[in-house]
Amino acid sequence: MTMKQYTMSKMNAETQTQTRESFPTDDPAVVTCGLPYANGDLHIGHLRTYVGGDIFSRALKRLGQETAFVSGSDMHGTPVAVNAAEEGVTPESFALRHHEQYETTFPQFGIEFDNYGHTHDETNVEMTREIVEALIQAGYVYEREIPVAYDPAADQWLPDRFVNGTCPYCGAHARGDECDEGCGRHLEPGEIETPVSTITGNDAEYRRREHQFFAVSELQSYLSSFLDRLEGTTNAQNQPREWVEGELQDWCITRDMDWGVDYPDDNDLVLYVWVDAPIEYISSTKQYAERVGTDSFDWKNAWRDIPGVRSHSSSSAKDSSEGNSPSNINNGGEIIHIIGRDIIQHHTVFWPAMLHAAGYTEPRAVMASGFITLEGKGFSTSRNRAVWADEYLAEGFHPDLLRYYLATNGGFQQDVDFSWSRFRERVNNELVGTVGNFIYRSLLFAAREFDGTPDVALSDSVEERIETAIDAFTAGVNEYSVRAVGDAAVKLAQFGNEYIQHHEPWKLSNDDPQKQQVMRDCIQLAKAIAVLFEPVTPAAAERVWADLGESGDIHTVGIESALVAPPQTFDEPTELFEKIPEERVDELTAKLADRVTDPTDDDDSDTDTETGTDVAETTNESHSESNMTEIDPIADERIDFEEFEELDLRVAEIIETEPIEDADKLARIVVDLGIEQRQLVAGIRQLHDLDDLIGETVVIVANLEKAEIFGVESNGMLLAAGADADLLTTREDADPGTSIQ
């Protein structure tokens, strides 16, 4: 952290109030994933959000929470229209082709949506018109004349991606609706400077045109209170405050196009893609309910807030505190949005404003994933710098391996890097060496020695250990930590390996009660691991379930099954995971390097995201999601080299974290420095999920004077960048204690 942050952390303390019931609740839950643009092929960087959503949905169901997991393809918007025109096909046929591809690809990776629709289907078109009509009737939509980019040579209006230019806020090159190369801000029509048509390459001109606006500014008070209630990852909770607490601008919700959902009573305008795209969450839930029956899942109970809609006056910035209280804000279900962090603004400002004004349930939580890099650099589909989803499968790797890597390789909101060498290391050491090794050796030994599970009671100590793992799993769900959900099973497997190794049952005779007890405990541990690991590695869990001779479907059992006695007889198992040879890594790394084309400009990665995951070029690159932070000027005063040498900067590994009582921003961090452990106090609690930091490599100032902060001794300083406290780390795996020079 900076010295300013360090000083402020010593001065500030705030408290939080938990307002929502923990999962599982009696209300229906809807878990959604950001809609992928039906615009190109999927690579593994795109899959992080969808794997995370699938894991979280499965985990909720495991706890007994009534849950619908839904998403769909985004068929509309200018990127689809632009690319369809380049291919000489209609936008609908272009988008449908990619939609059908996604319908095939997601299940191949164990991503099992309860419903996967698309924004151009009849259900979503009707639902969109219904909600927009509700906004109009409530007085939240008005007409305004604005400047709109126009190409005289093409005789065409230029909405969104049909125009490029300069961002008025930071001066970077930008698209018509987004500063994608600079500050990341959403741009309204008419804002972009020096506009250029992407159709002809000519300079565009601005002409006045009437468009429809949604009065987001009238909901500023509501949005501020909504953010106070919002759960999820800390980036989704904190990033929107700068927008909501600033000068909130109304939102242009129409475009001059013929591809999209028509604006009511005006066939010359279509709705902006960010209006109809999130409504697909509701439409997809409705389709699911219609398929299974409302007795199984009632979509209205999940999505509808209160009868009717709020009028402009009752839901405006003049809302009373009573109108914004949690008791009458949210009368529907538990809505959890799982997205990429580049679309936080849409899901925490525009979308909840629409829902609230139209009388629908506000989101309970938004979980925003970090980006994924590929061997330290951004994915670039235009340069073929990517590991494609179909390529991963064609190389013979099981989807569960990638699911585990994406779920547990860092916290969900943190950026993570994919490399074939790191992938091999995680698979061989953790899946093969820890989880697979324990389950295989336990089941094999029990099958050979006892034909299955010894007929003795589970020991109290192992039962308590499984209960602890169940508690950790449940806590992970309620803390919105995908990593913690996966770690619960892995830590139980680590315990199992230590347990069987300590007791060495192979040295005992079959009539020794101790041998029977140890193997009874180990088989129960194996079953518990399968139950807890199913959300992360569903296919592997299914195999363990079958190897145990269990009946029924492991994908539908409750978490309490982890403590139900396993069958007494089963056959010898097969090995769960296979090691990846080092030569495979060399082969795959070389294959990637050989095919990557030279960059055409200074950018290492393409960026093209609109309603979720834009797969035409790429998403999840390493650029900042907003870059709206003001950069401090570089200090004029210099220090000499001797002064710099006085700083003892060390690589450290975080081994323990906990919040400091009565200090909302402070956390106690214990780090391993190789030769000793140190305790630090850091003001990062509101910016990071503390559990996700365990095992992270960081940089600290090791020779800073000790300080007492909120009664806790701090022996060093954790270094981080910017207001979001982006923790400094090393590119390679430097050992704890390594000096930084």
UniProtKB/Swiss-Prot annotation:
Q: What class of enzyme is it?
A: ligase
List the HAMAP family hit by this protein, alphabetically.
Met_tRNA_synth_type1
The protein's required cofactors: Zn(2+)
Annotated Pfam families? Anticodon_3, tRNA-synt_1g, tRNA_bind
Q: Which UniProt keywords apply?
A: Aminoacyl-tRNA synthetase, ATP-binding, Cytoplasm, Ligase, Metal-binding, Nucleotide-binding, Protein biosynthesis, RNA-binding, tRNA-binding, Zinc
BP term (GO), one: methionyl-tRNA aminoacylation
Recorded protein name is Methionine--tRNA ligase
Where can this protein be found? Cytoplasm
Enumerate the NCBIfam families for this protein. Answer: metG, PRK00133.1
Per the database record, which ranges form the tRNA-binding domain?
643-741
Q: Which reaction does it catalyse?
A: tRNA(Met) + L-methionine + ATP = L-methionyl-tRNA(Met) + AMP + diphosphate
Gene for this protein? metG
Q: Annotated region Disordered: where? A: 1-25, 309-329, 591-629
Q: What is its main location?
A: cytoplasm
Feature: compositional bias, Acidic residues = 599-611
Instruction: Please indicate the residue ranges that the annotation assigns to the motif 'HIGH' region.
Output: 36-46
The cellular component terms of Gene Ontology attached to this UniProt record, alphabetical and capped at eight, are:
aminoacyl-tRNA synthetase multienzyme complex; cytosol
Output the Gene Ontology terms for molecular function.
Answer: ATP binding; metal ion binding; methionine-tRNA ligase activity; tRNA binding
Source taxonomy lineage?
Archaea, Methanobacteriati, Methanobacteriota, Stenosarchaea group, Halobacteria
> Which residues are involved in binding ATP?
381
Q: How is the cofactor bound?
A: Binds 1 zinc ion per subunit.
Q: Where are the transmembrane segments?
A: none
Q: Where is the composition biased (Polar residues)?
A: 1-22, 616-629
In the Enzyme Commission scheme, what number(s) does this protein have?
A: 6.1.1.10
